[in-house]
Regions:
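Charge-rich, well-structured scaffold segments of protease-associated domains
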Residues: 1-169
Length: 169
């Protein structure tokens, strides 16, 4: 197990953040590796079932049952869209920020999630989850240059800076 003191992932309309913290140097480096690998080299390219489990898929438990849509994100977003507070917050963002990414719900509208196809999902990842479109923040009692050199050597140097053109609108 990990000795982390904080580990999470959060999505926003214009970013995804992966904050981690550990008082143990070896554990911190391990968590950094896990996250860097998961973000820049995810299994989604080799295992389409991840998209089906996490995104959406059709499900039929018994042959007499009605065919239904299921999936982790799909079900989470159904919950978000049924919460009055979240509905109000969403309409507020649409009204205040009509020409920005904040007009969108980062998880997607449940009614439209089943329209997303696997290849579109992969294209989205290739475009937005790229080092040229990221910030990496380090803080704490560490040799920052050593960490930056490590991140460059093990991860960042394998990507070209001109691979991705970003338009957040």
């Amino acid at each position: 197990g990990s000795l982390n003191t904080f580990l999470n992932a959060m999505t926003y309309p214009d970013k995804t953040v992966y904050p981690v913290a550990s008082c143990n140097d070896v554990d911190f480096k391990n968590i950094m590796d896990v996250y860097m690998d998961a973000v820049f080299y995810p299994d989604i390219y080799n295992k389409p079932q991840i998209f089906k489990q996490e995104g959406w898929h059709y499900e039929l438990e018994n042959e007499d049952d009605e065919l239904k849509i299921n999936g982790v994100v799909y079900n989470e977003m159904k919950g978000v869209y049924s919460s009055p507070d979240d509905v109000l917050s969403r309409y507020t963002c649409v009204s205040l920020f009509p020409d920005t990414p904040y007009r969108f719900e980062s998880g997607g509208e449940p009614a439209h999630i089943p329209e997303l196809e696997y290849n579109e999902f992969l294209d989205y990842h290739k475009k937005f989850y790229h080092p040229v479109n990221s910030y990496i923040y380090l803080y704490g009692d560490m040799d920052v240059q050593e960490r930056l050199d490590y991140l460059d050597r093990e991860y960042l140097s394998y990507f070209d800076a001109d691979d991705v053109e970003i338009d957040a609108s």
